[in-house]
Amino acid sequence: MGMVRHTNESNLAGFILLGFSDYPQLQKVLFVLILILYLLTILGNTTIILVSRLEPKLHMPMYFFLSHLSFLYRCFTSSVIPQLLVNLWEPMKTIAYGGCLVHLYNSHALGSTECVLPAVMSCDRYVAVCRPLHYTVLMHIHLCMALASMAWLSGIATTLVQSTLTLQLPFCGHRQVDHFICEVPVLIKLACVGTTFNEAELFVASILFLIVPVSFILVSSGYIAHAVLRIKSATRRQKAFGTCFSHLTVVTIFYGTIIFMYLQPAKSRSRDQGKFVSLFYTVVTRMLNPLIYTLRIKEVKGALKKVLAKALGVNIL
């Protein structure tokens, strides 16, 4: 009965997100910087979504998946960053239990879906480069929608399992979360009972949603690189390399930071190091996506200029 009472008290009182409380002078600087990056992220990813929809030349599987990725980035930042900004600005760092619950489900579902979608995009790139004559037959709209749906549903499914298991743990009045967002690993640490099963389940999920997609991307990238080197046309070869390089850059930054967070032993890094890496993963990686794609892929740059020219009624060279 005592454990139940303490657990209920934690649920009613909510949690205290310590965030960057140890760096009071840095919090205001981070607030301004993160606010700017947040606005750039929303603007950049919304631009990619609109351009992909408005420009007929971009009505292709690659840009269909890219618009889904941008939509994911937009939703993730909108579910995480506002709470982070409040945490940095307000002296009171509390978050209601219900708010933490919504925060946990949204961020975990969107983040898990993001882990699957780049692997789907690599599949599209593999068919486009290695099987160009069969591309339109294989990558039809129904398959693209099915692959995108698979990514979304897998993210939602793993979230229902992991988040539910985590929130069933008794916290025994422990309210201080040494992070700036509600995440499964940090909430598991608050539990006052054994968490071996939760940690094992989280590790297995991390393998499935991180190592498996990364392995698939690396293998497909190897086949793509081999096929690109055999292209005789320098223009086509440069175009293929540019597209694949952009995708690999985004993938490397995204998976590199998240693997560091979820698969590195907790004892091998300091708690502050984990916070700053998490901050980079949460804010910076999603801002870089539109920047990298628009700078590296000529079709996106050309379509963006065309859409802006129509909107502004001017001729943009």
UniProtKB/Swiss-Prot annotation:
Pfam assignment, any one: 7tm_4
Residue numbers on the Cytoplasmic membrane side: 53-60, 124-142, 223-239, 296-317
Topology versus the membrane: Multi-pass membrane protein
Membrane-crossing segments per the record: 29-52, 61-82, 104-123, 143-161, 199-222, 240-262, 276-295
UniProt GO BP: detection of chemical stimulus involved in sensory perception of smell
Extracellular side: 1-28, 83-103, 162-198, 263-275
MF terms (GO), sorted A to Z: G protein-coupled receptor activity; olfactory receptor activity
Disulphide bridges: 100-192
InterPro entries with a match to the protein in the record: GPCR_Rhodpsn (IPR000276), GPCR_Rhodpsn_7TM (IPR017452), Olfact_rcpt (IPR000725)
Residue positions with a glycan: 8
Entry annotated with the keyword Transmembrane helix: yes
Compartments, as annotated in UniProt: Cell membrane
Record-linked SUPFAM superfamilies: Family A G protein-coupled receptor-like
Keywords annotated in UniProt: Cell membrane, Disulfide bond, G-protein coupled receptor, Glycoprotein, Membrane, Olfaction, Receptor, Sensory transduction, Transducer, Transmembrane, Transmembrane helix
Domain of life: Eukaryota
PANTHER family reported in the protein's UniProt record: OLFACTORY RECEPTOR
UniProt family annotation: Belongs to the G-protein coupled receptor 1 family.
Function text: Odorant receptor.
Protein name: Olfactory receptor 2G2
Gene name, Swiss-Prot/TrEMBL: OR2G2
